Every structure is written in structure tokens, then in C-alpha cells.
Amino acid sequence: MSKVNSEESSSSQKLLKEVEKISEALYVNKNPRGSVAGSNKTPTKPLSRSNLAEPKEKKSFWNWPLRAINHVRNRRFNCCFSAQVHSIEGLPPIFQDLSLTVHWKRRDESLSTRPAKVSNGRAEFKDKLTHTCSVYGSRSGPHHSAKYEAKHFLLYVSLVGSPEIDLGKHRMDLTKLLPLTLEELQDEKSSGKWSTTFQLSGKANGATLSMSFGYTVVGDTRNPASSGSTQNFRSSSNVKQTSNNTGLTRAISAKSSLGNGKSASRRYDHSIVNRESHPLSQNMEEIKDLHEILPAVQSDLGSSVNTLYQKFDEEKVDPANESQFEFDVVTKHIEPVESISHEKEDANALQSELVTGNETVVPFEEIKKAGEVPTAGSDEVGAENFPLEEPLVNGNETDVPFELLKKAGEVPTAGRDEVGTEILPPEEPLVNGNETDVPFEELMITGEASIARSEEAVEIVTEELAPEEGNKISPKNEESVVPKDAEEVMNGEKDLKEMIMKDLESALKSVEMLEATASEDEEDRKKHGDKDKYFITPMKETVPSCSRDVAESVACEFLDMLGIEHSPFGLSSESEPESPRERLLREFEMETLAAGSLFDFSIEGDDPQLECDENFPNEYESDFEEGFDLASLVHDIEEEYQLEAQARVSHPRAKMLEGLETESLMREWGMNENTFQNSPPHNGRDAFHPADFPVKEPFDLPPLGDGLGPVVQTKNGGFLRSMNPLLFRNSKAGGSLIMQVSTPVVVPAEMGSGIMEILQKLATAGIEKLSMQANKVMPLDDITGKTMEEVLWETSPTIDIGDRDHVSERESGDASGFVRGGERRTSFAAKPKKFGSSSGNNNFDSEYVSLEDLAPLAMDQIEALSLEGLRIQSGMSDEDAPSDITAQSIGDISAFQGKSGCVGLEGAAGLQLLDIKDDGDDDDDGLMGLSLTLDEWMKLDSGDIGDEDEINERTSKILAAHHANPLNFIRKGSKGEKRKGKKGRKCGLLGNTFTVALMVQLRDPLRNYEPVGAPMLSLIQVERLFVPPKPKIYSTVSELKKTDEEEEADASDAKKEEKPMEEQGIPQYKITEVHLTGMKSETDKKPWGITTQQQQVQSGSRWLMANGMGKGNNKLPLMKPKLGSAKPGDKLWSVSGSGSKWKELGKMGKSNTHIRNPNVIMPK
């Protein structure tokens, strides 16, 4: 007996000396917080007592006490930030079959996803990373808005196996997600979600990382400096691929009590622990985060004790023992039901006490636990080797150091490592009750318990500890070891657990039937190997029992499925705000979320405990043994069903909106419900051909603007006309064009009767001269940047005074009433309605029309030819010119030499035309300058040219150029018979065949009516025929007003003229051919007013390529190789229509109704 007492006495003395040395070491280190802050460079080997007194580097000015003072007036919120990684898209081919990992780092804590394999430039992730921390907010922002302490995170992607490859790093402050006011953060916006994308760089340049960030407030404290509530936070864990890591481990560290005797702890969840990460750096990070949570002003002694336990944490056993301990203790001595309950247990106390009867275990056992509880075969405890059989110290012999702790107000309560993981050796005796006479009730947690020694496992229950006087800890659910004599009670609870697990299994089976994505998860697990190897979402450990293995496996799969896939946004990265689905979703938000906000909706289907890795305050946690409530599972199923029901209800609404949008577009395009009644089925490229529409059915062209028709007149007498939508039926981008035409003119007959003859005469003038003549005779207004209303407003005065302009031109021009080129304005231009579509007017059914209807009738053919002309200009036509012809220069020979006898003009009218070659005189515009408007041509044809002595040189040129008949063909030459001749024969001076020309310019209404391609010249060949008189449908000619003298003369000769009138008939006009020509300059000249050839090519080719109407040629014209047989130089290209046979060819199903003519090369 004396020997035993002597051994106990020596042991007590030994411990007393040890305590004294520890106290000295603590008081030498004057800045314990600074030492904690500088822990990043601490050596990995266990610390000895000799280096405890060494001061640490890095004494930061902004230390923890100052930060605590700074946060006194701020409000603290415990926020759980989450990062949902969706996918990486657009990866280069070099990443094929490689694996990528996304890292989310906050200070020393780094979270990462499972490796995802790249397939076809895409890597899919289904992982959610969470980080819980304190956020301090104040109302110091503008207008009393909230201002939060920044929480910076680093996001980057690494290549598995080659982490040194930099693919881009992104820094972010997730407090930017929080609402503008603190009240919103506390009330309706306590959670939120935000989706975004990040661009990768380096070798992954061009790839996009899609992620969703969220936050959830799990608790807030008004006065953080005095808060005694316990906060649970997530541990720092590093993911690492190891072949031995087939289960999930849990790292544990003990914490001391802080401030006013109230306990605080940091709980580690189930997470993957990097074996190579040093435990010292993890513990240092824990202390940093603990100071962030509770930045209370502490005494030096309290801080020293805290640092002491931290340093004991660092003195762990070697990694092999640590691994053995974690697997032995956690995986072998924890039941599955207990593992699930541990996820929701309270973490107030750092270690539960071990008492037996009235005998209390001395709290210096914490020193053992701080260095990891030794397993069998491990003798290391802290920095000393204590024998397992060594009895614990007597409480009376440790009064002195603990009274110091008591005076300082710092109670080092026993901190628990892991509930149910403490296995006491059977040989270790407990403290003798006779030797424990020191009252520790004020220092320890009140309660009695006993150690149940079991060789198989330690059973765990939870009991409610009522607060007693002197106890500063709030009443929470505490875990203690059940006495052995309560075995019957525990057996009953075991049965209850098994029943609950059976119910859970049946519920899981029914849920799995509803989950369509369960099979996808199984395939993903097969691809990535062991399902538990890379899981980020916390999972549970299993026991060797086969039945419990099955139950735990089902539970793990279901919980993982809830955490990743049950969120309505879990499988999608949320589409771009500009997409129609996103707009439709936002439109239905207010109906869907009548009782919540947008942020609430974004995580409504998620389990908050799983989102935050179950790091909720204790008031949200409950024990599994008290009853596993399946209401949460049913709630998730009901929410999913409600979402599907809402989608079914929203579908009719979406159809209604689609119908309203279609109706609005049809009104905008001038279409109605009868438009598609006769439409054939769309079964081919040419299904909607103009021939499919009945010719006699009216077809309205789309209007040019609100309240406007399809035709608007321009200031100089030309017109703007919308084009047939069927021409753009193959447009991929839905583009369309409008056509601008100039005032029609009749070109001189001297230029030729056929298209090739006319082109050769035009080419002889050269490209620059021809451009100048065409722009002067047929000018086109520049309407780029103007609206249709502005064009109409500028034209209105012109239309009102059109007739007066015509009269004034007669008076101000030459004696015969003909004025020159751009100086004239005709009454013919005051009738824009005639330029509508001929397919909608039954008046054009006949091939013969009046002179005024010639140009409107030709519009339908010209607009189709103009698109082919645009392709030829841009080099995108499928047809090439059959040949190239060189124009013959007329030299200095007079155009009409030797033809005076044929002309048959008397006096001044018989003068021959002068040389039409350009001699430098600006007034001489060549043959093109002798063109006539339709009104002028009708007057000249009727013989209204004045007296012979009034015919000047220009009139003679015009008559000769148009091959006029002799004047005595229509009158006797006397002055008195001049007017009678006009009445007796209304026309006949000019020939019965002539050519009408007009300029055509295409414009894009979507780009401010800018020109598309270069202007083109349309040539319409007309034939006149006198038909028998019939009821007049059109006004065929413009009659001059009759005077009283004319009426008297007509009355006297009425009988004489009656028979010739009947024989003569009414003149009608027929279109025989329609041609379209344009210039293709190979030099940097200005054809048709376009600045350069490059601009000419780009303006047309850009529109054709954007709308996919360049046919089979995908190359730009500048990229096409030049044929060796092509002759260099400026060219005139041309295409010909079929005149009146247009509709017949359409009925035959021929879509290509034009003919490509040979190119005419202009002389240099």
C-alpha cells in the first residue's frame, strides 16, 4: 500500500512540475495571438517544451484585439456560402480525355471538386462546395445601406496530374451577393443564388466555366463581443486522390472554453481530409477562424491556455498512427444511426466529463486528448510518454494551477474529440473517490455519468442537461456515455432505431422511383470508380455489418442526391437573361412565388442542412434517436410535384403569349389570317414559289412604315418600294430589302434595239462618263439615315405643285418644252400608287397596258432580277457569263452620217446630229443625255414640238436620236392645221418600239436604309400596238387642255375625223423584255457613285452572307481564283428576264427565270 502511495505521490509531483514549467512557458510568450497568426511557417515535427517559449514572427498591427474592438458596433451574421460547379465548355482539343478539378479557396482553406473527364471540349461537374463563416455588417453605406466586411475567395481550375499549368485565376467577394439592407438579410432575403460564367485563360483560352453561387444566413448576433452562443463552422479540407482513401474520415481537435465561462467549439464535419496536409496548419487556421467568431477581449492567461491546447493539438502522433486512429475509432466504433445523428448533434462543450459516483476525473486528461487519444499500442500523449497503467492525479494536489484558472475566469472544460470515439483501456484505473475532495462543480459541467467499458462499441445517447447555479453554458443537447446498468433502455432504443431505418429504406425506394436522374448518378459513379472516393458532399461511415451496409449505402445515395440534384437549378447553369426561356421564367416569377422572393425560389427545393454541410446552430439540430422525421423527404417530393404542376399550368399561358406575338408580327408585316389559307405544305426548298399563289388573288406588299403603303415617292420623282417577301423565304436571318427606283426615261433609239447593242453603246462612253450620265439623267436621292416619314414630308410639296412644275418647265425651257436631265420634274411622278405589286391588281392581267403602267408592271420582274444582280456584283452567283465582248468605239464618226434622207425632217428639223463623242464640253452628255421622260416622249410623239422656226439644235438632236418620222407624216405644215393634226392623230411621230430605262438601288431597312450593293440600270423594251376602241380602263395619254378655238375647229371637222379615229384605235403598250445591267470595276474607280470597288463588294456581300442567300458559293469574291481566260478591265454584266412570260414560267415550276448575258468589256 505504501508503495502505491509513493508511486502516486511521485506521479503527482511530476505533474506539478510539469504544470509549473507550462505556466512559465506561457507567461514568457507575451503575444500568443501573434504566434498563432504566424503559424504558416511552423515546422511539421512535434513541438518540444524547449521551443514553446520561442517568440513567433509576424506581429501584425491589425491584431485580433483591435479587430474585436472594430466589430463591436457591427452586426454579425453566420453565412453559409455555396459554389455549385456546373460545367466547363469550349475546351481545346488538347484537353480531350484529361481530368480537370475546380478549386475554391478562402485563405488556407481550399475546397475542390471531383475530377471531371473532358469529352468533346466539355467537362461536367455535379459538385457543390460550401464555406461557412461570420460576416460583419453595418449601416455605414450610402443612405444607411448595408456595408459588409469583404470575404475574398479565389477560384481556379487545375489539370489533374499537372497542377502547375495555369488556366486562369479569378478573385471574388461573395458579400456582393448580400442584400442592400441588414433587415432584408435577416428577413425575406436570408438566402440567395447567383449564376455566372468565368473565362479561362492559358492553354484553356476560350473555355467557359459555369457556376452558381449562393448564400444562406444560418444565424446572426447583435453584439458579437458578448455573444455566448455556439457557432459551428466547416473545417478546412483538401481533396486529394489516394488509392487508400476509400472512406470518409473526420478530423477532430479540442478547443478550450473562451470568455465568461461560456464554451465555444469548432466542429469538423465529415469531409475528405488530405493526408499530406499538416495538422499544425489546420489547427492554426481553426484558431484564426475562432477569433473571427468570438473576438472577445481575453486575459493573457486565458489566451495562453488556449494556445497551450493548440500546441498540444500540433503534437500529434505520426500520420500512420493518426490514420490508424481515425479508421479504428471512427469506422469501427460508430453505428450508422449514430453517424447520422452526429451530423445534427450539439457542439457546445469541447469534451464531456467522465465521472463515476462522486469521483471526478481530473481535467488534465485533456492534455491526452489534445494530442489525439492513443490507440492500443500508442504510448505518446502530448510531449510526454505516460504509461497506460499510470493512475490519474489526485484533485487535492492540483489545486494551485486550477485556482489560477478559476481566478482568471477561464474554465478549461474537457473538450470532446468525437462522440463515441474515446476508447479507454480496461487496465486504466479511475480516480479514487476518497482522494477527490476538491469542489470542481463551479469549474466543470454539472452532471453525473459513468464509463461503460465495452469491447465492441460505445453506445451513445443524448440527454438534456438542465442549467444549474454557477453553470454559464446554455442548456443544449449534450452527449455523454451511458452507464452500463442502462443497457435495457439502450436495447429498446436500438429496436427503435432499426424500425426507423426500415421506414427510411422503404421511403428511399419510393423516392428513387420518382428520380429520373438516379441512373445518371450510377453511371457517373462507375466512370469515376468508387462512389465514396471523391464525394464532396458529406457522407457517413459504415460498419462491417451487411444489413447496415445496405441501409447506410441507400441513405448516402439519397442524401447525396438531395444535396446535388434535388435543387430546381442543380442540373442547369441558368440560361442567359436574353434567352426566351429566361424571359418567360421571369414573367411567371411573381405568380410562382406569391409568398417568397426570387432568392427564396432559387434554393426552395434544396435541403438547407445539406447545402451548408449541416453547419447549423444548435437550435436547428435535433437527435436522430428522438425520431427521424420523414417530413423533410415528403416536403421535397411535394415541392418537386408542385414545380411540375406549375409547368403544366404555365404551358397554356406560354402558348397564349406565343399566339399574341405571332399576331403582332403578322400585323407588322401586313399579313392577316387569310394569308396562308392557300399555302401548300412546306416539303422542299421551292415549296413556296410565286406560281403556287393564284395569279388573280390580291397580294399586298408589306408597308414601308406605320400608316404608310408599300410605295413612297422621293423628292426627285423616284420611288421607294417594298419587295415581295417570297423573294426572301430562304433568308436565314430573316432579312429583307426595299427597292429604290428613279424616274423612268426613254433612251434614244439610236442606242440600239437589242440588249447587247445597247450595252455596247453604253460601254463606249467609259465607266466614269457612263456613271456621270446615268446619275444626271436618272438621279437617286440619298435617303441613308432618314425615316420614311421624313422622306414623305420632303416629297409632299413636290407632289402638290407637280402640275405647276410641269407648266413652268415648258415656259422656262426651250421653245419645244423639253428640259434637260436632272432639271426636270414630271407630273408622271405624282402617282406612287401605280408602283405597287402587279400581282394584286387585276388591271395588269392583260399584256397590254398604258404607258404610265409600264414601269409598275416591270417592278415584279426587276426586283427578282435585282437579287441576282446583287450576287453577280458580289461574285456569289452560281452562273458565269457565257463570254466576254469588247465594245467597239465609235470614234469621231457622226452617229447619223448618211441618214438624213431617212429622217425626213424639214428645215431645222432636218439638221443632222452633231458628233456625240465627248469633246470636253460639260453640256454635251452624249446619247444618254438625249433621253426623254415619259411625258416628254408622249408630247414629242404627238407632234407637240412648236413651229418649225422654233425648233433649235437640241430638239433636232433629240428627234434624230429617237428616229422620229417626218413632220408631214402627222400634219400639213401650215400653222392653222397644226392643232388639228394633233387632234386628228394623237401619236405616230416616234416609232412603235422603244426602251425605257431606270436606275435601281437596293437598301436595307434594318440598317438605316443604307445602300446594299451598287446601283443597277434596268432596261425595259416596249412595243406599241393600236387596238380597237373599247371602254377606257386607264388614262392612256396626257391631254393638253382644250381652248374655245380648238373646240370650234373640232366641231367643224368632227364628221371627217370620226372614221379615221375608229380605224386608228387606242395605243397600248406591251413589255417584251426586261434587262438589268451593272458595272463591275476592276480598278479603283467610282461606278454608279460608289466610292470604291471594295465598298461595292462589301455592301452587297455582307448582306448576302449574313442572310445565307449567297447560294452555293461560300467564298468571298476577293478570295475566288481568277480564271485564266477572263479578260481584264471594267465590265458591264447583264441578266435578262422574260417579259410577259414571267408568270407562265413560274407556273411551270422554274424558279430560275433569268438568263445571263455575255459581259461587255469597256475600252480603257
Swiss-Prot record:
Disruption phenotype: Severe defects in both chloroplast and nuclear photorelocation movements resulting from the impaired regulation of chloroplast-actin filaments. InterPro entries: NT-C2, PMI1-like, PMI1_PMIR1-2_C. GO terms for biological process: actin filament-based movement; chloroplast avoidance movement; chloroplast relocation; nuclear migration along microfilament; response to blue light. Residues 69-217 form the C2 NT-type domain. It comes from the Eukaryota. Residues 30-54, 224-268, 466-486, 1038-1063, 1124-1164 are annotated as: Disordered. Its main location: cytoplasm. The keyword Cytoplasm applies. Residues 469-486, 1052-1062 have a biased composition (Basic and acidic residues). It is found in: Cytoplasm. Keywords: Coiled coil, Cytoplasm. Together with PMI1, necessary for chloroplast and nuclear photorelocation movements via the regulation of chloroplast-actin (cp-actin) filaments in pavement cells. This is Protein PLASTID MOVEMENT IMPAIRED 1-RELATED 1. It comes from Arabidopsis thaliana. The gene is PMIR1.
